[in-house]
């Protein structure tokens, strides 16, 4: 089976598919940015994904196929992240600048998010953890399914 478009997202309408048998394509976040790939479901079914250029990244809960009784969805593995809880705008700016110098991407969340606070989240890196410890910025290391994948930051001088 070749998947050429995303049919929706399970998280946006969970009740609509409650009676469907769910088959999962389990992916690390690094593969969410690939629009052409071969995958295998947790039931051993092989699928080809060939999404058109300009299609957004895959997301947790994306529906790849559906019929009257079955649904195949993307299930994203948790990512090892640092949840940074800067106490002031100055502290956040200094940390964000340091992450930018390392060409690390960060995602930002407000108090209404699942984090319950204004936080900055980046992929785990031991040098960033050492930096946060040395400057005394509060953080937690967690495993999280991120809403969008971290992308490799291109860089030139």
Swiss-Prot record:
**Record has Cytoplasm as a keyword:** yes
Cited Gene3D superfamilies: Urease metallochaperone UreE, N-terminal domain, UreE, C-terminal domain
Q: Which InterPro entries match?
A: UreE (IPR012406), UreE_C_dom (IPR007864), UreE_N (IPR004029), UreE_N_sf (IPR036118)
The signal peptide, as residue positions, is: none
GO CC terms: cytoplasm
Q: What is its main location?
A: cytoplasm
Task: Give a GO molecular function annotation for the protein.
Answer: nickel cation binding
Q: Name one GO biological process term.
A: urea metabolic process
- Enumerate the SUPFAM superfamilies for this protein: Urease metallochaperone UreE, C-terminal domain, Urease metallochaperone UreE, N-terminal domain
State one Pfam family annotation.
Answer: UreE_N
Tell me where it resides: Cytoplasm
Q: Which UniProt keywords apply?
A: Chaperone, Cytoplasm, Nickel, Nickel insertion
This chain's function reads: Involved in urease metallocenter assembly. Binds nickel. Probably functions as a nickel donor during metallocenter assembly.
What protein family is recorded? Belongs to the UreE family.
Q: What is the name listed in the Swiss-Prot or TrEMBL entry for this protein? A: Urease accessory protein UreE
Provenance organism: Paenarthrobacter aurescens (strain TC1)
């Amino acid at each position: 089976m070749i998947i050429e478009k995303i049919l929706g997202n399970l998280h946006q309408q969970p009740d609509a598919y409650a009676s469907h048998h769910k088959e999962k394509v389990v992916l690390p976040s690094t593969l969410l940015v690939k629009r052409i790939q071969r995958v295998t479901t947790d039931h051993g079914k092989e699928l080809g994904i060939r999404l058109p250029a300009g299609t957004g990244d895959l997301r947790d809960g994306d529906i790849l196929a559906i019929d009257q009784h079955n649904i195949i969805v993307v299930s994203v593995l948790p990512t090892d992240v640092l949840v940074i809880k800067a106490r002031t705008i100055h502290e956040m700016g200094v940390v964000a600048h340091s992450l930018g110098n390392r060409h690390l991407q960060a995602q930002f969340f407000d108090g209404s998010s699942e984090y319950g606070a204004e936080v900055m989240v980046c992929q785990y890196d031991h040098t960033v953890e050492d930096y946060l410890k040395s400057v005394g910025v509060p953080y937690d290391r967690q495993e999280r399914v991120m809403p969008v994948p971290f992308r490799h930051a291109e860089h030139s001088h």
